[in-house]
Amino acid sequence: MEYDLTKQICSFLDAHMMLPLINYLKDTQQYQENEINKAMADILSQTGCCDYAINAYESIGRDTAPLQAKKQELVGELNKLKEQCSFVTQYIESKKQQKEQQKELKEQQKEQQKEKDTDKTTPTTTDETTTTTTTAPTTTTTTTTTTITPITVIPFSQLLEKITPEILDSIYRFSKLLFEIGQYGSAREHLEIFLQLSPTHQNKDKRLSALWGILESDILSLNWGQAVGDISPLQDQIDSNGTPVEQLGQRAWLIHRALFVYFYNPESRSSLVDLLLEDKYLNAIQTTCPHILRYLAVAIIVNKKKQQSNVFQRILNALVRVVEQEAYVYRDPITQFISSLFVKFNFEDAQAQLILCEKVLKNDFFLNTCVDEFMENARVCVFETYCNILESIDIDMLCKNLRIDPESSEKWIVEAIRNTRFSAKIDSANNQIKMFTQHNSYRQVMDKTKALFNRGIEMVVGINESRSQQNRKGGDNRKNQRGQNRNQQNQQNQQSNESNETTTTTTTAAAATTTTTTTATPTSA
């Protein structure tokens, strides 16, 4: 219908992966039955499931002769490849039998242990006057123990010796044919053996194809536990092979297969968020498949209660940013709900979109299992936004907008306040929710900035005081140094004066002696 994404998603899937989506459209009656039957016949004709394709052709009156011929051809090729890969099939079967045998042995050991525990019973009865001990009659139970002959498993080294490039290619083609005819479990087992036998530095394209086959086999076999583990090796292989354009296409294919894995395995939905928010995969979404934003938004909202508030807010901000960037390319009620609530703060439009979201989720193959969870968490998001903006909230208005039963509204509101950790109380007299003073984000920024400013001033004052102290100490030192210099200069001057005085005295004494001598000499006649 208007918001149905089956056509867009099927363009990234092969025929086998399309079948569950077409069956769901048939169950939900979103399209006319004859259109669904024609689409089913066209898809089945692309697979090797010839019997189903023949039935689909007959239901719409098409000629089945081409499918009959195709069936005969596939049977002949299957028998030929089966014979060439017989020793690989024997190895796989022996491994499976060994596992079943080990399981039987464990069950036998558990039963024997239970019988031993039940045999250990010795009840006693006590009377007030006489004490009598009654021993329960012993019953002998005959336990039949079946001797299990251990199964001989073909050694892997022996299997490796028989492998040639031709046989390795036969294993690959046999695995692919098993997948085509719908034997997904056997196909996975043979593909796994192919990967073990194939050298890592050779057959890179076939190894990548085998990894895709293993993932799709687990998905179609509903083996979700192993399918989760299949994604990581594929990511590594995609990152290390191909051109950037090829890697972009491969990542888009992986994203669409991941929808099967993560939405049908609720415990790992957070892993889908981590995958889709990686830069490489977010780029693939924006470039090739913006419709995946629907599933990213649902996964984030559904996982709200499982994440810390700061982590959820960071992820939500990333979602809002990419939804706004791609709004001109892709829109649906889910992305418009995100935009109306977290960007425009238009509660009326958000509520209108939320009503449409419920219909879209119920008709979506991947999202129909999480309708209630999404709607509940979306209401909590609306309530949180109300609380962040308004100081008082009318309860009747809240119940009307969020479609909450008035009788159970008080319980819902109390639980929502507790989970969101808001400071609020219910005013029963006025039928309102009173919010205590909430610090807006800009106020918190101002308060933190003010504290940093005050701290900066304190640091500047401290630095100036330190410098002043250093200057004062430096001034005192300089004064002391000048005083010492003066004293030294005075001492030097004093010593110089004393030296000059001594020299003058000596000269005067010498002059006096000379004069006296000259005067005393007699004059000759």
From Swiss-Prot:
Component of the eukaryotic translation initiation factor 3 (eIF-3) complex, which is involved in protein synthesis of a specialized repertoire of mRNAs and, together with other initiation factors, stimulates binding of mRNA and methionyl-tRNAi to the 40S ribosome. The eIF-3 complex specifically targets and initiates translation of a subset of mRNAs involved in cell proliferation. The keyword Lipid biosynthesis does not apply. It is found in: Cytoplasm. Belongs to the eIF-3 subunit E family. The keyword Glycosyltransferase does not apply. Residues 102-120 have a biased composition (Basic and acidic residues). Residues 121-143, 482-525 have a biased composition (Low complexity). Its main location: cytoplasm. It comes from Dictyostelium discoideum (Social amoeba). It comes from the Eukaryota. Disulfide bonds: none annotated. This is Eukaryotic translation initiation factor 3 subunit E. HAMAP family: eIF3e. Residues 261-440 form the PCI domain. SMART domains: eIF3_N, PINT. One of its GO terms (molecular function) is translation initiation factor activity. Keywords: Cytoplasm, Initiation factor, Protein biosynthesis.
